[in-house]
Amino acid sequence: MSSARDSQAQHGLKRAASPDGSGSWQAADLGNEERKQKFLRLMGAGKKEHTGRLVIGDHRSTSHFRTGEEDKKMNEELESQYQQSMDSTMSGRNRRHCGLGFSEFQEVEEEAAGHSSDHESSEDSESGSDSEQDESAEELQAAEKHDEAAVPENKKEAKSNYKMMFVKASGS
């Protein structure tokens, strides 16, 4: 108990809150009224008063209004930018962002299929007799069977190449 009395004597007694409210920021004497208002405003205790200034965007001379022509021009520019980005996305010029499932081999197959159909139609138009058409059709079927037999090997090679490229890229 003596230790509690010693510590109380060293630090002194706590004061009770003043009943008259002298601890209030409003009662602080800072000189003139202007300094008092500034102090209260900085402490977050003062009420903000309207200073007579315009609110941003209120005055027509300071705000920037667009005319109808400017709106149309801006919309056309935005539309053209959008179309350019969509065209580049759809045409596939930007191959960096293809993702993990992308394979160049699939595109090569599609192009080859497109060329073979073009080639087939040109042969049909050139040949005049039925026998020539039958022979060309048989040749095309044989070539397609040969292509089908080669495709699984190519797919396996493409997959292994793709995996190796992926492993190399992730390892570095």
Swiss-Prot record:
Residues 1-172 are annotated as: Disordered. Residues 46-76, 112-122, 142-160 have a biased composition (Basic and acidic residues). Expressed in otocyst. It comes from the Eukaryota. Residues 123-138 have a biased composition (Acidic residues). It holds the Pfam family SMAP. InterPro entries: SMAP (IPR026714), SMAP_dom (IPR028124). Coiled coil: none annotated. Residues 1-10, 80-92 have a biased composition (Polar residues). Belongs to the SMAP family. This is Small acidic protein. It comes from Coturnix japonica (Japanese quail). The lineage of its organism: Eukaryota, Metazoa, Chordata, Craniata, Vertebrata.
